[in-house]
Curated annotation (Swiss-Prot):
Membrane topology: Single-pass type I membrane protein
Name of this chain's protein: Disintegrin and metalloproteinase domain-containing protein 7
Function: Required for normal male fertility via maintenance of epithelial cell morphology in the caput epididymis and subsequently correct epididymis lumen structure required for sperm development. Plays a role in sperm motility, flagella morphology and tyrosine phosphorylation during sperm capacitance. Plays a role in normal expression levels of HSPA5, ITM2B and ADAM2 in sperm both prior to and post-capacitation. This is a non catalytic metalloprotease-like protein.
PANTHER family, per database record: ADAM A DISINTEGRIN AND METALLOPROTEASE DOMAIN (PTHR11905), DISINTEGRIN AND METALLOPROTEINASE DOMAIN-CONTAINING PROTEIN 7 (PTHR11905:SF21)
Signal peptide residue numbers: 1-23
Disintegrin domain ranges (all copies): 402-488
Disulphide bonds in the chain: 310-389, 350-373, 352-357, 460-480
Residues in the Extracellular compartment per record: 26-669
Annotated GO CC locations: plasma membrane
């Protein structure tokens, strides 16, 4: 006992002494030199230009360390503080005061070492350079001697072999979380389906009274300390495409709000209960951390619930905050967060190239990488538990307006963006210009392979169910086409169910998910229990009041199963034993009451068949025509109708839907075009006729009529010679091709020398015989 007390006293003395950092060896005095930017980046603004910012968006510092010159390239962190960030303090009387801050200007940066492929940095420039940087497998801590970014600084070298405070140890509360059945919201969300898509964790941190008193001067010391930790954690989790964002802090000024027990597991249970009952009522977050400065937990430095993320009670952890080095504390925070995301301790052969992994059990020095084992465990966690709370983006709408090459986002004018040149690992993208390298057609996407777009027809998203369809590459885009599936209401599993959002929900499958593969749906008699109106038998819950089912809806309330083992989900099981009068046998009706993301997953899932042409929807058994707005798809497609997330009707390849509305629209457009063409042609003809008439009148004025002797025709009565202005001709050529009948109607004064051709008269069949001559 006495040696232990002496050891603790020595550690306390060491922490009080200035610039003594445990866990490091050696120190070197350096003078960082601020460098001008080699190329000014095109940076968008997310706020008013009138607001003058104290801290620049991009910085470069030169540090001469161990006879080598390092150039530190830093970009101001943009996503480690949420738009709804708040701070809560307590008065002497225990009253809580909360203020909401719009943080537009801060001094926290992330970056890398120029020309060092494997490097990283998490730095604060508030009062000099303070933080962490890594070059290959060597890690450094930098601290200012004076409050200046170009004055004296000390650089410490982390050494995992140097003993400090106590060998790191953590623990997990012993409980098991079973796979959460797929709910329609998370299953239909493309972000949840794509494991590698961005996820977001809204983090809230509570500091106990001891941590507050140790960091109360200057007044913003504790805030900057916590911000530095979160900036470090954010940098670590970016490698998993997770953005860890701080949405608030609470400082237990003057007294702790729970009793901090000597047993850390007991303290975790108390803190979990407090945050769910009190903290959750005034702040939304995904995970909460308690920073405790008490010397009561022996060698254990942290604790959390395994795979507890997004469960209101279990998304909690405790971190022991006893060291002056924030990087060590932040690394422990990242470690416990990993447990909450389903990761376990790394043991051989689970290793990292740089030597240390985030999930190493010793946690002796800061680590930035996750082993392949940890990555696989996290991906399996996403598939098993579907943590939908990680989908909402905690940034303002205009956050993406901040555009520049190197932000790992595809901005306007960019072909690719793999991050800063020192961090880029994409062989297809030029990190300096954010354009594809010569000869390449893509940099990323499900339809991009070896920097080339896959050929058309390559499957990029296989079918997950008989109600789903595989998606294939188009041959001209690196992205996989939008997910499409069979129309809602299409019969599936031998008519046991109907397709719903690409799945075929049945009671049999839901029972096996809730309990185990041996479980199946129980007898129909069980569903009469849904008329009771309690948490084990109801259809709807309004303000914590369980409403009984109407007779027509009993099969859409709680689901009742038989067989299988007891559920290991965090919920309550209930088994009824009912008498079946027809078979004179006892029937087991097993159900469960469990909330997941504010939804009782013990209810019959929406889309489950409850009768012919009937499906469950929010505790009611309804006709599919009332539930689905795409039930007319089978009438539009000959067979195999499809649907998508927008409930739009499609047909499989080779079929064309009878889109009457679209056909009518096309017909109307065609008619309109024809009418317009006819009108234009008519106007043109009218103009030509007017010009033609004017031309005739003009010629009549310029040339007098030509009198032509009539041709002798014995068809006339007598031998009288007639003088006519209208010649009788064997051939007449008019531009407008008049008929003989129209010629007979011409006026006797008509004369047109330009359009009538005169030819010698000849005897032909058109001549009229002289009756006198015939008589002779």
């Amino acid at each position: 006992m006495l040696p232990g007390c002496i050891f603790l006293m020595i550690l306390l003395i060491l922490q009080v002494k200035e610039k003594v950092i445990l866990g490091v060896e050696g120190q070197q005095l350096v003078y960082p030199k601020k460098l001008p930017l080699m190329q000014k980046r095109d940076i968008g603004h997310t706020h008013d230009d009138d607001i003058e910012e104290t801290y620049e968006e991009e910085l470069m510092y030169e540090i001469k360390l161990n006879r080598k010159t390092l150039v530190l390239h830093l970009l101001r962190s943009r996503e480690f503080l949420g738009s709804n960030y708040s701070e809560t303090f307590y008065s002497m009387k225990g009253e809580a005061f909360t203020r909401h801050l719009q943080i537009m200007d801060h001094c926290f940066y992330q970056g890398s070492i120029v020309h060092e492929y494997d490097s990283a940095a998490s730095i604060s420039t508030c009062n000099g350079l303070r933080g962490f940087f890594r070059v290959n497998d060597q890690r450094y801590l930098i601290e200012p001697v004076k409050y200046s970014d170009e004055g004296e600084h000390l650089v410490f070298k982390y050494n995992p072999r140097v003993p400090y405070v106590a060998n790191y140890s953590c623990t997990e509360l012993n409980f098991t979380r079973k796979t959460v059945p797929g709910d329609t919201e998370s299953e239909g969300d493309p972000k949840m389906k794509a494991i590698h898509n961005e996820k977001y964790i809204e983090l809230f941190i509570v500091a106990d009274d001891t941590v507050y008193r140790r960091n109360s001067h200057p007044h913003n010391k504790l805030r900057n300390r916590i911000w530095g930790m979160v900036n470090f954690v954010n940098m670590i989790y970016k490698t998993l495409n997770i953005h860890v964002t701080l949405v608030g802090i609470e400082i237990w000024t003057h007294e702790d709000k729970i009793e901090l027990h000597s047993n850390i597991e007991t303290t975790l249970l108390r803190f979990s209960s407090w945050q769910e009952r009190i903290l959750k009522t005034r702040k939304d977050f995904d995970h909460v951390v308690l920073l405790s400065g008490k010397w009561i937990y022996t060698h254990v430095q942290g604790i959390s619930y395994p795979a507890g993320m997004c469960l209101p009670y279990y998304s909690t952890s405790i971190i022991k905050d006893l060291l002056p080095d924030t990087n060590i504390i932040a690394n422990r925070m990242a470690h416990q967060l990993g447990h909450n995301l389903g990761m376990q301790h790394d043991e051989f052969p689970c290793t990292c190239p740089s030597g240390k992994c985030v999930m190493d059990s010793d946690g002796s020095i800061p680590a930035l990488k996750f082993s392949k084992c940890s990555q696989n465990q996290y991906h399996q966690y996403l598939k098993d538990y579907k943590p939908t709370c990680m989908l909402n983006i905690p940034f303002p709408c205009n956050f993406d307006d901040f555009q520049f090459c190197g932000n790992k986002k595809l901005d306007e004018g960019e072909e690719c963006d793999c991050g800063p040149p020192q961090e880029c690992t994409n062989p297809c993208c030029d990190a300096h210009t954010c354009v594809l390298k010569p000869g390449f057609t893509c940099a990323e996407g499900e339809c991009c392979e070896s920097c080339q777009i896959k050929k058309a027809g390559s499957i990029c998203r296989p079918a997950e169910d008989e109600c789903d369809f595989p998606e294939m590459c188009t041959g001209h885009s690196p992205a996989c086409p939008k997910d499409q599936f069979r129309v809602n209401g299409f019969p599936c599993k031998n008519s046991e169910g109907y397709c719903f959002m690409g799945k075929c929900p049945t009671r049999r499958d839901q029972c096996s998910e809730l309990f185990d593969d041996e479980a199946t749906e129980s007898h129909d008699i069980c569903y009469k229990m849904n008329t009771k109106g309690n948490k084990f038998g109801y259809c709807k819950n309004k303000e914590n009041r369980f409403l009984p089912c109407e007779e027509k809806d009993v099969r859409c309330g709680k689901i009742y199963c038989t067989g299988g083992e007891l559920s290991y989900l965090l919920g309550e099981d209930k088994t009824y034993h009912l008498k079946d009068p027809q078979q004179n046998a006892t029937v087991k009706c097993k159900t469960i009451f469990l909330y997941h993301d504010s939804t009782d997953i013990g209810l019959v899932a929406s889309g489950t068949k409850c009768g012919d042409g009937m499906v469950c929807n929010n505790g009611e058994c309804l006709n599919m025509e009332k539930v689905y707005n795409s039930t007319n798809c089978p009438s539009q497609c000959h067979e195999n109708p499809m649907d998508d997330h927008g409930l739009q009707c499609h047909c499989e390849e080779g079929q064309a839907p009878v889109a009457w509305e679209e056909t009518l629209n096309v017909t109307n457009v065609a008619i309109l075009i024809v009418v317009l063409v006819l009108v234009i042609v008519g106007i043109g003809v009218l103009i030509l006729l007017i010009r033609y008439q004017k031309c005739i009148k003009l010629k009549q004025v310029q040339s007098p009529p030509i009198e032509t002797l009539g041709v002798e025709n014995k068809g006339y009565f007598g031998d009288e010679q007639q003088m006519r202005t209208e010649p009788i001709l064997p051939e007449i050529h008019f531009l407008n091709q008049r008929t003989p009948e129209s010629l007979e109607s011409l006026p006797t004064s008509f004369s047109s020398p330009h359009y009538i051709t005169l030819k010698p008269a000849s005897k032909d069949s058109r001549g009229i015989a002289d009756p006198n001559q015939s008589a002779k």
